[in-house]
Design a protein with these regions (language model features):
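Short beta-strand segments
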Residues: 77, 149-150, 189
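Short acidic, glycine/proline-rich loop/turn micro-motifs
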Residues: 120, 158-162
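Hydrophobic/aromatic ligand-binding patch that stacks against planar heteroaromatic rings
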Residues: 122, 138, 176-180
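A cross-family acyltransferase "interaction/gating" segment
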Residues: 28, 162-240
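Positions that flank functional sites
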Residues: 138, 154-155, 192-194
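Membrane-anchoring hydrophobic helices of lipid-metabolizing enzymes
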Residues: 2-105, 109-134, 203
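Active-site-proximal segments of catalytic enzyme domains
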Residues: 113, 143, 147, 152-159
């Protein structure tokens, strides 16, 4: 192709970039913000397995990106579904990879997310923080794009028979945060996530015993054990 780098040159460049990245990690020459967000690690490593899911497995079609400002604080409010909160991760990839300004979505998560080993650290590294008004206001005042899924565990814990029916929102602290910071509220609709883990039942007794919000039973979870966590392919639309 005209203008394309020769394969050996492109490979050498990638190797050099990787070695430079590893050198920065070893020497500590990288930045982490006050919330624990590590931009370089997120973009180069943590988002890498999500991109094939976005483009190939879910074939995400993103609409309405022109409604997202290039700069300044704004609050994205989306529906929540899919048993496992992959919808939030796909929304983040949509904004980072496909918005002209490559905007990073700073997601607000429940307490349980940050209390869970590995998951909590991953969430912090990718820019998420606790779903509370003070943190939301601090991010909005800094000009960040903040994402919230106000249905919370009720959204991801509903049976397949209630797919695409909005559940009761939380207390609405995110609205007051947007009002106090004079930030626009941008609705986001996600279609396709309901089909990736069709829920048959929610074993609430087991959930209480294990100290979690939901113990989901789907056509593959827990029957196939770790393999059951592989989401079913579906066509997604994310519209702002």
């Amino acid at each position: 192709l005209p203008g394309a780098e020769p394969a050996p040159v492109a490979w050498d460049r990638k190797v050099a970039e990787f070695l430079a990245f590893m050198r920065r990690r070893v020497t500590g020459d990288y930045e982490v913000d006050e919330f624990g967000y590590d931009r370089e690690l997120t973009d180069r490593v943590l988002n890498a397995p999500l991109r094939p899911l976005y483009s190939k497995w879910f074939r995400v079609e993103t609409r309405g990106l022109e409604n997202i400002p290039d700069t300044g604080g704004a609050l994205i409010v989306a529906n929540h579904s899919g048993t496992v909160a992959i919808d939030s991760l796909m929304t983040s990839i949509a904004l980072l990879d496909h918005h002209p300004a490559r905007r990073q979505l700073r997601m607000l998560g429940a307490n349980l997310v940050f209390q869970t080993p590995v998951v909590g650290e991953y969430a912090r590294k990718t820019g998420s923080t606790l779903a509370c008004a003070p943190d939301a206001e601090r991010l909005l005042n800094k000009g960040e794009l903040v994402g919230v899924w106000p249905e919370g565990f009720k959204g991801v814990g509903k049976p397949f028979s209630e797919r695409y029916k909005l559940q009761r929102f939380g207390r609405g602290g995110f609205v007051s945060a947007a009002l106090r910071t004079k930030s626009p509220i941008i609705p986001c609709a996600i279609v396709g996530a309901e089909e990736i883990y069709p829920m048959i039942s929610n074993a609430k007794t087991l959930a209480r015993i294990m100290g979690v919000q939901n113990f989901t039973i789907t056509s593959t979870i827990p029957w196939l054990r770790p393999l059951g966590l592989e989401p079913l392919p579906s066509k997604w639309i994310i519209e702002f």
